Regions:
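Generic alpha-helical secondary structure signal
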Residues: 6-13, 66, 70, 83, ...
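N-terminal capping segments
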Residues: 1-56
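Solvent-exposed, flexible loop/coil residues
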Residues: 23, 31-32, 66, 73-76, ...
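Active-site signature of cysteine proteases
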Residues: 114-149
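...with weaker cross-activation on analogous glycine-rich loops/strands in unrelated enzymes
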Residues: 54-126
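Compositionally biased, intrinsically disordered low-complexity segments
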Residues: 3-6, 17, 72, 109, ...
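A generic structural signal for ordered secondary structure
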Residues: 18, 104-106, 130, 140
Length: 149
């Protein structure tokens, strides 16, 4: 049974309801994996699905961060890492020194205040937890912008 939602902030509410979950099993098994995989993107997809956003084509179902980046970029629904995001956007990271060509990690923007971006991220230390970063932080690759109207 899905947690039905109607606005971008509802994806935030779904993510908030999952804070403290560890291991990612509900998310990667929902996706179709039989054993644990890196699940940050799967968690973002699961939250979107709870809102009906995957069926509606608002957010893709993706297990690899690069696929998500390309989906948003191809649709012109992308902000650079220097931008100030809004709640409900997906925040993509590329870690310093990474060998990944596109992105390493993804979370959901919970709020923005006083020059900081507050996030909820799956697979952060193998759990769903809150983090925060300065706006424009160098490891933020950019933001996927769900369009709900």
């Amino acid at each position: 049974e899905k947690i039905l939602a109607t606005t971008a902030s509802d994806m935030v509410a779904v993510a908030q309801s999952q804070i403290g979950q560890t291991g990612g099993q509900p998310y990667w098994s929902w996706y179709g994996f039989g054993s644990r995989v890196e699940w940050c993107a799967i968690f973002a997809s699961w939250c979107a699905d709870q809102c009906g956003y995957i069926d509606a084509g608002i957010v893709p179902k993706f297990a690899g961060c690069g696929v998500g980046v390309q989906w948003f970029q191809n649709r012109g629904q992308w902000l650079p890492g220097s931008a100030t995001p809004e709640p409900g956007m997906l925040i993509f990271f590329q870690w310093y020194g990474s060998d990944s060509s596109i992105a390493d990690h993804v979370g959901i923007v919970e709020s923005v205040a006083d020059g900081r971006v507050y996030t909820i991220e799956g697979n952060s230390g193998d759990q769903v937890r809150r983090n925060s970063y300065p706006v424009g932080y160098g490891e933020i690759k950019g933001y996927g912008v769900p369009v709900t109207d």
